[in-house]
Amino acid sequence: MELDRDKKTFAYFWLFGLINNILYVVILSAASDIIGPSLPKSIVLLFDIMPSFLIKLSAPFFVHSIHYDKRIPILILLSMLGIILVSTRSLWLCLPGIVLASLSSGFGEITFLQLTHFFGSKSLTGWSSGTGGAGIVGSFSYLLLTTVFRLNIQLSLLLYAALPLIFLLYYKINDSIVSSQVYQSLDMPIDSSDGPIELLKSNGWVDIVKRLSKLVIPYMIPLSTVYLFEYLINQGVAPTLLFPIDTTPFVKYRDIYVTYGTLYQLGVFISRTWGHKLPVKNLYLFSVLQLINLLITLSQSYYYWTDSISWIMVLIFYEGLIGGSSYVNCFMNILKDVDPNEREFVLGSVSISDSLGTLIAAFLGIILEPSLCKHQIGTGRPWCRME
């Protein structure tokens, strides 16, 4: 019975992770199609991450007042409306659509990470694997629809609008997988005098800031720097990691960019699914390894020291492995090391870190990609301006 419940817990949270992150991934995969080759892809990243970061940053001060049951319809509405606007391919409608989808993704990550406090390690491994699965399913399905099947880009994006309805499975949790003890925890009134929710309400903003400050060195800095380095690669450098199209297996240069995204997400999926089997206590190891990857890709973009796309594809895949491992180990360490009375708060709060690193990368990438592209054009490599 316990084993069966564990399997269902994993399955439900895998789906929640998949759906929560898939639109974020699809939007990044479609960056070159949304804004074209002449603008930095980091503009899309900026709009895809800024709202998510802001809601995560402010959530510790208000999220306790919204019951989990009420959060799900909000996530569904924001996601569906967001991707519908993005599918119009009109830049001035796409950007607000990206903002709505980003709000849903950030609020969803807080919600489901906090729920893992009640459901334990199986829910966290399911969520982590599902978010990794969102990467590979989102990027590969978009690659398949637009590059292999050559489906209309507007229709391809619109097909994703129905996926957020899968969040409705949340309402089956109590009937399917929750023991009576967890059931009581989830269904208690939001203003109950028990548990971490009331502790949060009774503390002032100063106390909340103090609690957040304790998370900076062990969890937030290593996670945010890993995301900073990998998204600088993905959005600032990868669009310039190009080769003569006749030396590659691709038809268009935008196909190279989409393929890089798919390889990265494959690495993320593998490490988020199985990374917990190789536990790492010192999270700064991942920061160092990802910095090395950034330096290697920067040198390739600037100096063009190899004319083999295969080596770069392997490196992008490895970059994804590092990023996914950092994420799953960070939250696994929290489940193991943090006091249960603080765990729900910590799980929701540390998710600020990945968005912060990605947000900084978006700002830097807006400068970095055009600079690298300008240098390449000046040295006889004009591919970054070609479709």
Swiss-Prot record:
Signal peptide limits: 1-31
**Origin, by domain of life?**
Eukaryota
* Membrane association type: Multi-pass membrane protein
**One GO cellular component term:** vacuolar membrane
Identify the keywords attached in UniProt to this record, alphabetized: Amino-acid transport, Membrane, Signal, Transmembrane, Transmembrane helix, Transport, Vacuole
Among the GO biological process terms of this entry, one is: regulation of intracellular pH
Q: TM segments? A: 43-63, 72-92, 93-113, 129-149, 151-171, 225-245, 257-276, 278-298, 308-328, 347-367
The record ties this protein, via SUPFAM superfamilies, to: MFS general substrate transporter (SSF103473)
**Where is this chain's protein located in or outside the cell?**
Vacuole membrane
Instruction: Please report which protein family the annotation says this sequence is part of.
Output: Belongs to the battenin family.
As for what it does, the entry says: Involved in vacuolar transport and vacuole pH homeostasis. Also required for cytokinesis.
What is the protein name for this chain? Protein BTN1
Q: Which organism is it from?
A: Kluyveromyces lactis (strain ATCC 8585 / CBS 2359 / DSM 70799 / NBRC 1267 / NRRL Y-1140 / WM37) (Yeast)
